[in-house]
């Protein structure tokens, strides 16, 4: 969506492995260790927004490891970005059921909620947490989690019905909503699937 939107002039992608998309707007940085961003921090200056979409499934992962991959990595990114770009908008893709009180009995909900609070309390010009339920892939997007891709194939016959569910959004709407909220701020900072879809209309 950023590549198609004339309001976006450059996209910095920080990935562990290269993507197969070539475009004049894209500046791709390959970085393996997200617990230490010191070697690439000079690349993170002078940006208006961060769309933080990195995450892992909690299935089969102990809390200590999930905490490091979810909270600690985000904390490292937030600290570096705030030092260079305190006036940016930071948008975090969290998840439906995340717990801002950090008291949930569900491990991932506590960790996601704590991560949201970290972002909101840092002091960026603006910040949002997206809490989608089901994310429908659009425009050829595929998840790196094989299980999710298999589920999408199985659910394909009922996708038209799923689109009517409030928790359901799409990769396309998430991208459009991120751009829209960067350009036009709103009061609601934690967005459900239906609120993401509404923000995508901006």
List the model feature ranges, each with a label.
Residues 20, 27-76, 80-84, 99:
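NAD(P)H-binding glycine-rich loop region in Rossmannoid oxidoreductase-like domains
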Residues 18, 33, 133-136:
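Glycine-rich beta-alpha junction loops
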Residues 13-20:
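Short, polar loop motifs at secondary-structure junctions
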Residues 1-7:
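N-terminal Rossmann NAD(P)H-binding glycine-rich loop of SDR-like oxidoreductase domains
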Residues 7, 24, 101-201:
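Oxidoreductase cofactor-interface core, primarily capturing Rossmann-like NAD(P)-dependent enzymes
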């Amino acid at each position: 969506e950023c590549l198609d939107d004339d309001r976006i002039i450059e996209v910095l992608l920080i990935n562990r492995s290269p993507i197969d998309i070539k475009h004049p707007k894209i500046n791709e940085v390959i970085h393996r260790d997200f617990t230490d961003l010191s070697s690439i921090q000079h690349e993170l200056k002078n940006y208006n927004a961060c769309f933080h979409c990195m995450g892992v499934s909690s299935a089969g992962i102990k809390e200590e490891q999930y905490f490091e991959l979810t909270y600690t990595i985000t904390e490292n990114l937030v600290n570096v970005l705030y030092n260079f770009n305190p006036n940016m908008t930071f948008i975090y893709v969290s998840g439906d059921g995340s717990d801002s009180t950090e008291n949930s009995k569900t491990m991932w909900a506590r960790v996601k909620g704590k991560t949201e609070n970290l972002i909101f309390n840092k002091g960026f010009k603006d910040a949002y947490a997206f809490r989608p339920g089901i994310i429908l892939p659009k425009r050829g997007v595929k998840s790196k989690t094989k299980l999710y891709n298999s589920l999408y194939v199985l659910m394909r016959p009922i996708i038209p019905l799923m689109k009517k569910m409030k928790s359901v959004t799409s990769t396309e709407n998430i991208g459009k909503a991120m751009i829209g909220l960067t350009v036009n701020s709103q009061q609601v900072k934690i967005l459900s699937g239906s609120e993401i879809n509404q923000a995508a209309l901006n």
